[in-house]
A protein has these predicted regions:
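C-terminal motif of bacterial Sec signal peptides marking the signal peptidase cleavage site
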Residues: 19-21
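Bacterial signal peptide processing site
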Residues: 23-25
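Beta-strand-rich interaction surfaces with strong enrichment in secreted/lumenal proteins
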Residues: 50-52, 123-129, 154
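Short, well-ordered beta-strand segments enriched in hydrophobic/aromatic residues
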Residues: 60-68
Length: 219
């Protein structure tokens, strides 16, 4: 028979090892539950790649990059217009709408709806993307989200019903027929923009998604 003191001496270290193993496993469990500061995803679609998709406490953040294979003008420089008619470039803005549970974020030239008349269509500014070069962009959609389209009234969107996110970027082939104009916004930042007619017929799109809506981060 073993001496009781010796048996206890053998059992105690084993218990301590088991407890230590449980303590070390807790961070892995928290990580598996998605408790990360940001949710990063990557998915390519031709020239466009989404490099990050995060649902923060105050905004949905989408970061993307564009990679040039042929010379194009990227239509991703949106602006806001004041009551006095002044334009202000909005580097974080995208057109926002919901379609069947998908939050669609668009940076492109949009057609004027047939049921309305406008004095002048909204034409975003453009950036040159040359072969072998890259451009980056960031979109921040403030929460709670709202529809943001150039020819429609803003209205709230129900975040709980949005299951995924789609990104669409417009671009124009660099051809002689493309008419570009030089301008500046209300604080003097330069802007190049195309004529609406030639651009709306030549515009092409790069799409990524739908991507799963990320979990909202905790403060």
């Amino acid at each position: 028979l073993r001496h009781p003191a010796r048996v206890a001496a053998c059992i105690l270290p084993c218990i301590l090892v088991m407890l230590a193993g449980c303590a070390r496993s807790q961070p892995a469990t928290a990580q598996a539950e998605g408790k990360k500061p940001m949710a990063a995803v990557q998915e390519s679609s031709g020239m466009l790649r989404v490099t990050e998709l995060s649902l923060m406490q105050d905004a949905l953040v989408v970061r993307y990059s564009l990679h040039g294979e042929a010379p194009v003008w990227v239509v991703d420089q949106l602006f806001s217009t004041s009551a006095a008619g002044y334009h202000h470039l909005e580097p974080e803005r995208a057109y926002v709408e919901a379609r069947d549970g998908v939050l669609v974020l668009t940076r492109a030239l949009l057609p004027v709806p047939d049921d309305i008349e406008v004095e002048a269509p909204e034409v975003p500014c453009v950036r040159k993307l040359s072969p072998g070069e890259s451009l980056t962009g960031e979109i921040r959609v403030r929460l709670p989200p709202r529809q943001d389209l150039p020819y429609r009234d803003s209205r709230p969107l129900d975040l709980a019903t949005l299951r995924s996110v789609k990104l669409r970027i417009g671009y124009l082939p660099d051809v002689p027929e493309l008419e570009l104009h030089e301008s500046k916004d209300d604080v003097g930042r330069p802007c190049r923009y195309p004529s609406f007619g030639p651009a709306i017929t030549r515009q092409q799109f790069a799409d990524v998604g739908p991507l799963p809506m990320p979990a909202r981060t905790t403060p």
